[in-house]
Amino acid sequence: NLFCFTAHMSTENAWSAYGNDACRCINSNLYNSIDLRDFRRHSWLDPARKDPEKESYDYKSCRKEGKEYFNELPDYANIKFRPAQGAYEDFKVGGAADHPYMRVEEMYFIEAEAKAHENLGEGIRLLNEFMNGHRIVGGGYDCTNMSSSVESFTNELMLQKRIEFWGEGIVMFDMKRL
């Protein structure tokens, strides 16, 4: 059970100390750069969840003790990767989760980057379309003002890829390439 992705990345499993006790967390600066309307923001525990004075997302856990368990975890803890079928106590079932080798979202980002090198406006349009259609609840994302050049567009695209593929090892290849 220690050699599966879920054992290392899921904070909710009770059968591995790697994901559960090590508790991989997103960098607070990266977390704070995520739009408040972006549903991906709920892949990590918001520090506001512990403050009754602040409004925060109602996180759901597969664990019986749910909210109490999440409140014990550190701020910004990853809950993006979860045990299969919610089986946090049974590694034979919970460890049989999907492994993110390649996702269709990667193709959207590749297309937007490639188009931006041909025609910056087209790359901007594709990224805006993807973000508003698939990530930002209610729309409103627009990277036009952040993308006055291919370089500034690539920086914004890479930010979105870092958020999208956090913990999946995909962006490492972009960092080497760029």
PLM region descriptions:
Residues N1-A7, T11, S28-L178:
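Acidic/polar-rich alpha-helix caps and helix-coil junctions
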Residues A14-C23, K92:
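Acidic/Ser/Thr-rich, low-complexity mid-to-C-terminal regulatory regions of eukaryotic proteins
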